[in-house]
Amino acid sequence: MSCRPHPASRGILLDRRRFLAGAGAAFVAGLGTHSAAALERADALFGASCRRPDGSYGCAIFSERGEIVSTVSLPDRGHDVAYDPVRRRAVVFARRPRTFAIVFDPVSGETLQTLTSIEGRHFFGHGFFSPDGALMYATENDYDAAHGVIGVYDVAAGYRRIGEFDSHGMDTHEAL
Protein backbone atom coordinates (compact mmCIF):
# COMPACT_ATOMS: atom_id res chain seq x y z
CA MET A 1 0.00 0.00 0.00
CA SER A 2 1.39 3.38 -0.92
CA CYS A 3 2.21 5.52 2.08
CA ARG A 4 3.17 8.77 0.37
CA PRO A 5 2.23 8.91 -3.27
CA HIS A 6 4.06 11.24 -5.60
CA PRO A 7 1.69 14.12 -6.46
CA ALA A 8 1.78 13.22 -10.15
CA SER A 9 1.25 9.49 -9.61
CA ARG A 10 -2.02 9.60 -7.63
CA GLY A 11 -0.75 6.51 -5.80
CA ILE A 12 1.08 3.43 -6.92
CA LEU A 13 -0.33 -0.02 -6.32
CA LEU A 14 1.79 -3.14 -6.57
CA ASP A 15 0.79 -6.76 -6.54
CA ARG A 16 1.18 -7.63 -2.85
CA ARG A 17 2.93 -10.96 -3.38
CA ARG A 18 5.49 -9.58 -5.85
CA PHE A 19 6.16 -6.63 -3.57
CA LEU A 20 6.53 -8.81 -0.45
CA ALA A 21 8.94 -11.15 -2.19
CA GLY A 22 11.23 -8.25 -3.08
CA ALA A 23 10.68 -6.44 0.20
CA GLY A 24 11.46 -9.53 2.24
CA ALA A 25 14.74 -10.02 0.41
CA ALA A 26 15.67 -6.38 0.97
CA PHE A 27 14.76 -6.56 4.66
CA VAL A 28 16.82 -9.68 5.29
CA ALA A 29 19.80 -7.88 3.77
CA GLY A 30 19.67 -5.62 6.82
CA LEU A 31 19.12 -1.99 7.53
CA GLY A 32 21.41 0.36 5.69
CA THR A 33 22.74 3.63 7.03
CA HIS A 34 21.38 5.50 4.04
CA SER A 35 17.66 5.55 4.92
CA ALA A 36 17.51 9.36 4.81
CA ALA A 37 18.98 9.34 1.31
CA ALA A 38 16.50 6.63 0.29
CA LEU A 39 13.65 8.78 1.56
CA GLU A 40 14.84 11.81 -0.41
CA ARG A 41 14.92 9.76 -3.63
CA ALA A 42 11.50 8.16 -3.06
CA ASP A 43 8.37 9.06 -4.98
CA ALA A 44 6.29 6.62 -2.91
CA LEU A 45 6.68 4.61 0.28
CA PHE A 46 5.38 1.12 0.91
CA GLY A 47 4.85 -0.77 4.14
CA ALA A 48 5.02 -4.50 4.81
CA SER A 49 4.86 -6.57 7.96
CA CYS A 50 7.68 -9.06 8.25
CA ARG A 51 9.32 -11.71 10.38
CA ARG A 52 12.94 -10.92 11.08
CA PRO A 53 15.77 -13.46 10.90
CA ASP A 54 15.85 -13.62 14.72
CA GLY A 55 12.15 -14.62 14.79
CA SER A 56 10.82 -11.26 16.00
CA TYR A 57 8.20 -9.32 14.06
CA GLY A 58 8.33 -5.89 12.54
CA CYS A 59 6.99 -3.57 9.90
CA ALA A 60 9.33 -2.10 7.31
CA ILE A 61 8.80 1.01 5.21
CA PHE A 62 10.45 0.89 1.76
CA SER A 63 10.95 3.20 -1.16
CA GLU A 64 9.74 2.07 -4.58
CA ARG A 65 13.36 1.06 -5.24
CA GLY A 66 13.27 -1.40 -2.33
CA GLU A 67 15.45 0.77 -0.07
CA ILE A 68 14.55 0.55 3.61
CA VAL A 69 13.46 3.91 5.03
CA SER A 70 12.47 2.78 8.55
CA THR A 71 11.34 -0.17 10.62
CA VAL A 72 9.19 -0.54 13.71
CA SER A 73 9.11 -3.51 16.09
CA LEU A 74 5.84 -5.37 16.62
CA PRO A 75 4.83 -7.51 19.61
CA ASP A 76 3.52 -10.24 17.31
CA ARG A 77 2.70 -10.83 13.66
CA GLY A 78 1.39 -7.77 11.83
CA HIS A 79 -0.55 -7.61 8.59
CA ASP A 80 -1.32 -4.40 6.71
CA VAL A 81 -0.40 -0.72 7.03
CA ALA A 82 -2.71 2.30 6.76
CA TYR A 83 -1.38 5.80 6.19
CA ASP A 84 -2.82 9.06 7.55
CA PRO A 85 -1.72 11.70 5.02
CA VAL A 86 -2.95 14.54 7.24
CA ARG A 87 -0.77 13.69 10.27
CA ARG A 88 1.83 11.73 8.27
CA ARG A 89 1.54 8.72 10.53
CA ALA A 90 1.12 5.07 9.75
CA VAL A 91 -0.74 2.34 11.60
CA VAL A 92 0.17 -1.32 11.28
CA PHE A 93 -2.61 -3.70 12.30
CA ALA A 94 -2.20 -7.08 13.92
CA ARG A 95 -2.97 -10.16 11.89
CA ARG A 96 -6.04 -11.96 13.16
CA PRO A 97 -6.70 -13.02 15.87
CA ARG A 98 -4.37 -10.50 17.52
CA THR A 99 -5.51 -7.36 19.30
CA PHE A 100 -2.87 -4.66 18.70
CA ALA A 101 -2.34 -1.84 16.25
CA ILE A 102 0.83 0.29 16.31
CA VAL A 103 0.78 3.98 15.37
CA PHE A 104 4.22 5.06 14.16
CA ASP A 105 6.18 7.65 12.23
CA PRO A 106 6.93 6.02 8.87
CA VAL A 107 10.02 8.17 8.33
CA SER A 108 11.78 7.62 11.67
CA GLY A 109 10.16 4.33 12.70
CA GLU A 110 9.31 5.81 16.12
CA THR A 111 6.37 4.08 17.83
CA LEU A 112 3.90 6.80 18.81
CA GLN A 113 1.09 4.76 20.34
CA THR A 114 -0.09 1.19 20.81
CA LEU A 115 -3.80 0.52 20.39
CA THR A 116 -5.65 -2.49 21.78
CA SER A 117 -8.96 -3.75 20.43
CA ILE A 118 -11.89 -3.67 22.82
CA GLU A 119 -12.91 -6.75 24.77
CA GLY A 120 -14.65 -9.30 22.58
CA ARG A 121 -12.95 -8.08 19.40
CA HIS A 122 -9.76 -8.71 17.48
CA PHE A 123 -8.34 -6.95 14.47
CA PHE A 124 -8.61 -8.49 11.01
CA GLY A 125 -5.40 -6.80 9.89
CA HIS A 126 -6.67 -3.86 7.83
CA GLY A 127 -7.77 -0.27 8.30
CA PHE A 128 -7.99 3.08 6.58
CA PHE A 129 -8.48 6.77 7.33
CA SER A 130 -11.25 9.16 6.36
CA PRO A 131 -10.16 11.66 3.68
CA ASP A 132 -9.81 14.43 6.28
CA GLY A 133 -7.83 12.16 8.65
CA ALA A 134 -10.32 12.68 11.49
CA LEU A 135 -11.39 9.05 11.71
CA MET A 136 -9.66 5.72 11.41
CA TYR A 137 -11.64 2.62 10.49
CA ALA A 138 -10.44 -0.89 11.38
CA THR A 139 -11.73 -4.28 10.28
CA GLU A 140 -12.58 -6.27 13.40
CA ASN A 141 -14.22 -9.50 14.46
CA ASP A 142 -16.99 -9.70 17.05
CA TYR A 143 -16.13 -13.30 17.85
CA ASP A 144 -18.99 -13.93 20.32
CA ALA A 145 -21.57 -13.00 17.66
CA ALA A 146 -19.43 -14.50 14.84
CA HIS A 147 -19.62 -11.50 12.54
CA GLY A 148 -17.38 -8.76 11.22
CA VAL A 149 -17.57 -5.10 12.15
CA ILE A 150 -15.81 -1.90 11.20
CA GLY A 151 -14.49 -0.15 14.31
CA VAL A 152 -14.50 3.67 14.18
CA TYR A 153 -11.73 5.59 15.97
CA ASP A 154 -11.40 9.33 16.70
CA VAL A 155 -7.83 10.17 15.72
CA ALA A 156 -7.66 13.58 17.46
CA ALA A 157 -8.84 11.95 20.71
CA GLY A 158 -5.86 9.60 20.74
CA TYR A 159 -7.50 6.96 18.54
CA ARG A 160 -10.39 6.54 20.97
CA ARG A 161 -12.90 4.01 19.71
CA ILE A 162 -16.19 5.86 19.21
CA GLY A 163 -18.33 3.23 17.54
CA GLU A 164 -18.71 0.52 14.99
CA PHE A 165 -20.95 -0.63 12.18
CA ASP A 166 -21.77 -4.05 10.82
CA SER A 167 -19.74 -5.22 7.84
CA HIS A 168 -22.50 -7.67 6.86
CA GLY A 169 -20.14 -10.61 6.85
CA MET A 170 -18.32 -13.07 9.09
CA ASP A 171 -14.72 -12.49 8.09
CA THR A 172 -14.25 -8.82 7.32
CA HIS A 173 -10.86 -8.65 5.73
CA GLU A 174 -9.80 -5.70 3.64
CA ALA A 175 -11.89 -2.54 3.41
CA LEU A 176 -11.29 0.30 0.97
Regions found by a protein language model. Give the residues of each.
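Repeated scaffold domains used in trafficking and secretory/extracellular systems
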Residues: 76-82, 122-126, 170-174
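N-terminal secretory signal peptides and thylakoid transit peptides that target proteins
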Residues: 3-26
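C-terminal segment of N-terminal export signals and the immediately downstream linker at the start
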Residues: 13, 31-62
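A short beta-strand motif characteristic of beta-propeller blades
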Residues: 67-73, 110-117, 160-165
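Short, solvent-exposed loop/turn segments at conserved positions within beta-propeller repeat blades
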Residues: 52-55, 95-97, 143-148
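Short loop/turn segments that connect beta-strands within beta-propeller blades
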Residues: 63-65, 106-108, 155-158
